[in-house]
C-alpha cells in the first residue's frame, strides 16, 4: 500500500483497548477477537484511538519517528503493511479526507 495523501484512518468503534508497559491488547467486541500489540503497534493504535476525526499516514509516520529509532524507508513500509492488515481485519477504516 502506498501512502495516500487524501486518506484518513479511523479506529473501528467496536474495538476496545488496554495498554501495558510493553504493548497492548485490542478486543473487537463485534467479532469476539482479541489481538496483542507490540510497543510500536500500541503507539499507532493509541494515536488512532485518540484522534477520532482520523489521522493521515504521515501523522502515523511522525508519531513513530518521534518515539522510536527506525529508518524512514523501513518505517513507511512497516506502517503501510500494518494499516493494510488492520483494515483487512476490520479494525480500522480508511476514508477520504474532508475538504
What are these model-derived regions, one by one?
Residues 1-42:
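Acidic, low-complexity/disordered tracts enriched in E/D and polar residues
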Residues 33-99:
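Long, charge-rich, low-complexity alpha-helical segments
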